[in-house]
């Protein structure tokens, strides 16, 4: 059996292409089932977010698994298989495990270390579980990856520092005020950066937010979308009297907030602190307003220094996490190797217990006068003999799991004891017209 990860992400396809190959939320369940019914696929989990569409699968063979996954994606989105091949990364074996660990812990995200992907991976796994498209391998591997990511975020600072300008703007406000949930915020502009700033403010607990924009309808649309207030640009001087935080991002060629405007309202503010963060280029806020008492201004250069420093911190944290990935891969492989041993040991125990039961039946026939107490004593001792006899063979079987030729040696082990281990994938293998009775080999 082989682990395969087929990924369409921000490295392999631009946003226009990624939009074409994103599963809608209500289509993920049926997509998992459709893929599971595909030849060669034994387990699968589908992950689809704004930045990536990925298929994780356990397949009977690498080349057929990869082919059927890519064909499935092409069919799902009405594209040619060659188009899908050109926009996918394919990882197999240990590299597939490594990829899942990196994705889950935010190391493969557009924003290094972001935590949203962890929840998305968890949801994708749970959905697949509910549709019975996961089995022994993925039920273990995805839980391992989720646990690893949680531990990575708890033990490092990878998600603690802002690495986007809009997020840094809000973080800077927190540095000035401490808590911002009780502050009033004003956003000047209604473009993408303004919306990101708005979302970060909302995420930080700010509820009193007003948007102003030269085109009032755009301010209204954005405000209604996120349930905040909006005002015309003409209201700006009046709004500046009461707000605590201003984030400005317009495409204006002239200053939106001027020294003169701020001087005129400074006495009305009663010396309450006003933090103004200008993320526009060219700048929206006239420089040198710091000369006005209790007013503080920051521009993109100030934020860039914060973002760069934070990114360096995240990169250092990422390096710590990366160092732990080989240990996780090794732990996974050790667990997988034991999978081949468990059914062998079970078969050995079942045969031994069958012999013990047959022996007790023979004793009952030959010694019908045994009391219940005597029978229990004999049964206990025969079981004890069997357990003692099995101790060394079971120990040897477990040690075979780490051998490079474990499959061959386990087959010999079964032959010596005349046992046949059950295969967890028997039904699926029959569907795929594969030979039955093999010991699983994972890569």
From Swiss-Prot:
One of its GO terms (molecular function) is NADP binding. Gene3D superfamilies: Glutamyl-tRNA reductase, N-terminal domain (3.30.460.30), NAD(P)-binding Rossmann-like Domain (3.40.50.720). Substrate binds at residues 49-52, 109, 114-116, 120. The active site is at 50 (nucleophile). Its EC number is 1.2.1.70. CDD domains: NAD_bind_Glutamyl_tRNA_reduct. PROSITE patterns: GLUTR (PS00747). It comes from the Bacteria. Disulfide bonds: none annotated. It catalyses: (S)-4-amino-5-oxopentanoate + tRNA(Glu) + NADP(+) = L-glutamyl-tRNA(Glu) + NADPH + H(+). The keyword Oxidoreductase applies. The record marks 99 as: Important for activity. NADP(+) binds at residues 189-194. GO terms for biological process: protoporphyrinogen IX biosynthetic process. Pfam families: GlutR_dimer, GlutR_N, Shikimate_DH. Pathway: Porphyrin-containing compound metabolism; protoporphyrin-IX biosynthesis; 5-aminolevulinate from L-glutamyl-tRNA(Glu): step 1/2. Homodimer. Catalyzes the NADPH-dependent reduction of glutamyl-tRNA(Glu) to glutamate 1-semialdehyde (GSA). During catalysis, the active site Cys acts as a nucleophile attacking the alpha-carbonyl group of tRNA-bound glutamate with the formation of a thioester intermediate between enzyme and glutamate, and the concomitant release of tRNA(Glu). The thioester intermediate is finally reduced by direct hydride transfer from NADPH, to form the product GSA. Possesses an unusual extended V-shaped dimeric structure with each monomer consisting of three distinct domains arranged along a curved 'spinal' alpha-helix. The N-terminal catalytic domain specifically recognizes the glutamate moiety of the substrate. The second domain is the NADPH-binding domain, and the third C-terminal domain is responsible for dimerization. Belongs to the glutamyl-tRNA reductase family. This is Glutamyl-tRNA reductase. It comes from Staphylococcus saprophyticus subsp. saprophyticus (strain ATCC 15305 / DSM 20229 / NCIMB 8711 / NCTC 7292 / S-41). The gene is hemA.
């Amino acid at each position: 059996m082989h682990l395969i990860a087929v990924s369409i992400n921000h490295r392999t396809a631009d946003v226009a292409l990624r939009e074409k190959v994103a599963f809608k939320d209500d289509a993920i369940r049926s997509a998992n089932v459709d893929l599971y019914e595909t030849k060669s696929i034994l387990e699968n989990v589908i992950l689809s977010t704004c930045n990536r569409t990925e298929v994780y699968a356990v397949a009977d063979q690498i080349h057929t698994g990869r082919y059927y996954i890519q064909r499935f994606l092409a069919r799902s989105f009405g594209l040619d298989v060659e188009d899908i091949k050109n926009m996918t990364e394919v990882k197999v074996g240990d590299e597939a495990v490594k990829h899942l660990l990196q994705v889950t812990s935010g190391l493969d995200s557009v924003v290094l270390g972001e935590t949203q992907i962890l929840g998305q991976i968890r949801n994708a796994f749970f959905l697949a579980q509910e549709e019975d498209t996961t089995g022994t391998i993925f039920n273990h591997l995805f839980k391992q990856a989720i646990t690893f990511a949680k531990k990575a975020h708890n033990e490092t600072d990878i998600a603690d520092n802002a690495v986007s300008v809009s997020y840094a703007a809000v973080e800077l406000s927190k540095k000035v005020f401490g808590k911002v949930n009780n502050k009033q915020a004003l956003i000047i502009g209604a473009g993408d950066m303004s919306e990101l700033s708005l979302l970060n403010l909302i995420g930080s607990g700010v509820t009193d937010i007003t948007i102003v924009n030269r085109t009032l309808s755009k301010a209204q649309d954005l405000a209604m979308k996120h349930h905040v207030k909006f005002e015309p640009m003409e209201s700006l001087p009046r709004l500046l009297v009461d707000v605590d935080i201003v984030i400005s991002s317009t495409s204006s060629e002239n200053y939106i907030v001027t020294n003169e405007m701020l001087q005129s309202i400074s006495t009305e503010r009663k010396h309450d602190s006003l933090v103004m963060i200008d993320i526009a280029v060219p700048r929206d806020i006239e420089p040198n307003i710091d000369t006005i008492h209790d007013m503080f201004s920051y521009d993109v250069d100030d934020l860039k220094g914060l973002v760069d420093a934070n990114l360096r911190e995240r990169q250092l944290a990422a390096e710590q996490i990366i160092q732990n990935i080989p240990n996780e891969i090794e732990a996974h492989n050790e667990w997988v190797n034991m999978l081949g041993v468990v059914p062998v040991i079970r078969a050995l125990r079942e045969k031994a217990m069958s012999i013990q039961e047959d022996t007790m039946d023979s004793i009952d026939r030959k010694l019908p006068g045994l009391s219940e107490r005597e029978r229990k004593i004999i049964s206990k001792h025969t079981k004890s003999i069997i357990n003692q006899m099995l101790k060394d063979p079971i120990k040897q079987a477990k040690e075979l799991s780490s051998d490079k030729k474990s499959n061959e040696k386990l087959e010999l082990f079964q032959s010596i004891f005349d046992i046949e281990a059950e295969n967890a994938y028997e039904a699926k293998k029959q569907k795929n017209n594969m030979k039955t009775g093999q010991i699983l080999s994972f890569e």
